[in-house]
Amino acid sequence: MRVLVTGGAGFIGSHIVTALREAGHEPVVLDALLPSAHPTAPAPGAAAPPAEFVHADVRDAWSVAAVLRGVDAVCHQAAMVGLGRDFADAPDYVSCNDLGTAVLLAAMAETGVRRLVLAGSMVVYGEGRYDCLRHGPVRPGARRPEDLAAGLFEPRCPDCGSALTPG
């Protein structure tokens, strides 16, 4: 299977590229090599076994559509993590993560690529503060495997089990 790994030169992406190659698949790496993620840019293929490398930004619709031709599936890892130094970085963060994902999804629809593995973030598994109506600010632990297996993905108050809202 030919698999596009966006952000494939990053830490997680490069490990996915390695696993794909070892499983007999053909990984294709698309990475912008942004200085915020790669202070010293890796040479294409240096972080993983040799793979086709496309130096492009996931927000570039033309480049994304071009690299998707002939691809069977996508593993989307391209993202900015955290907000960098301060909230002034928020526009870049939203542009890369939200616009980049939207550009990728539109290009996948245009080119007929129907398989996608979408990376989440630590926010999904409960990192951060939440508010309970009865107990105020709480920090729930990691989701319980039995809750996840039952499709219960939202965090609950560790004291009373009530639904929480992000704090």
Q: What residues fall within each predicted segment?
A:
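N-terminal Rossmann-like NAD(P)+-binding domain of SDR-like oxidoreductases, especially those catalyzing
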Residues: 1-167
